[in-house]
């Protein structure tokens, strides 16, 4: 079962990366110098792609100097935002952010919701979820929120039943019915698509699915629905930086008609605008 130690260990392991960012200037440079560029930490796909669209097509006319730094993990963007190495980040959902703050004592806050990446169940071995054999192994993300989302997805697909009211805090201990006797392999979220040759199926976050050339709208055996989904990806800053004029400009651009059209055209339903 996932616990605080896993994220805490990851924070320590990510320290070298964060220090590398800090070495480029004082801890307050990125967050407090509103005359310089706004440095945003982001996952490569689709977050950095969306930010680079803004940078290349919209930022100059809005008077925004935007710099994008890519990260492939779900820890360093928050630690870098907390220590001021970057001015903002764009990679996570509100439930993940709340859980991260609680477990790590950070002070990151949401600015605006931008898009939803539907979580999906994928397999190289079966074409339909009900074809999974008894005792099948399912890879799921090991961070608290995405693990809960993964189990909720499997429940929505009719593969298991969870205790009432557990929401995204669900763990395998909350399973009340498991007719296929599924077993679970908990992995860092980025590793789940790479596990597809070794497990019967894997629950993969939308951004990592796209990076792995999976098409969520087409390839997923079970896919999260957008309606009523609390897991939109958001632009976040350290508490106190919400009124930075650069952040306000970026928030407006990220929720513009131009960005909505870019998301619709580029991702064809695999990423959905939240505005």
Mark where each language-model region is.
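Short helix-initiation/N-cap motifs at beta->coil->alpha
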Residues: 68-79, 167-194
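Sec-dependent bacterial lipoprotein signal peptides
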Residues: 1-22
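Ligand-binding "clamshell"
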Residues: 99-111, 126, 198, 203, ...
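A conserved helix-loop-strand patch within extracytoplasmic ligand-binding domains
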Residues: 111-160, 260
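Bacterial lipoprotein signal-peptidase II cleavage site
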Residues: 7, 20-35
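Short, polar/charged alpha-helical segment
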Residues: 45-67, 76, 80
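A bilobed periplasmic-binding-protein/Venus flytrap-type ligand-binding module shared by bacterial periplasmic
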Residues: 118-129, 231-244
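Short, well-ordered beta-strand elements
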Residues: 33-45, 64-70, 137-138
């Amino acid at each position: 079962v996932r616990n605080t130690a896993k994220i805490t260990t990851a924070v320590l392991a990510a320290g070298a990366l964060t220090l590398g960012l800090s070495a480029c200037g004082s801890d307050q440079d990125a967050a407090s110098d509103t005359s310089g560029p706004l440095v945003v930490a982001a996952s490569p796909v689709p977050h950095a792609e969306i930010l680079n669209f803004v940078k290349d097509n919209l930022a100059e006319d809005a008077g925004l100097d935007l710099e994008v730094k890519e990260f492939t993990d779900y820890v360093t963007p928050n630690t870098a935002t907390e220590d001021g190495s970057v001015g903002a980040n764009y990679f996570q959902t509100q439930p993940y952010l709340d859980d991260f703050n609680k477990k790590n004592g950070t002070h990151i806050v949401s600015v605006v919701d931008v898009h939803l990446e539907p979580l999906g169940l994928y397999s190289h071995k079966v074409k339909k979820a009900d074809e999974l054999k008894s005792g099948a192994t399912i890879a799921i993300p090991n961070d608290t929120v995405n693990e809960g989302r993964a189990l909720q997805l499997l429940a929505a697909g009719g593969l298991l039943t969870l205790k009432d009211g557990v929401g995204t805090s669900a763990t395998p201990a909350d399973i009340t019915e498991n007719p296929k006797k599924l077993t679970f392999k908990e992995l860092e979220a980025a590793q789940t698509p790479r596990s597809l040759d070794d497990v019967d199926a894997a629950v993969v976050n939308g951004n990592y699915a796209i990076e792995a050339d999976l098409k969520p709208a087409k390839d997923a055996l079970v896919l999260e629905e957008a309606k009523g989904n609390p897991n939109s990806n958001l632009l976040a800053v350290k508490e106190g930086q919400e009124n930075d004029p650069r952040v306000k400009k970026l928030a407006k651009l990220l929720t513009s008609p131009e960005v909505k059209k870019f998301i619709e055209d580029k991702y064809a339903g695999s990423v959905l605008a939240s505005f």
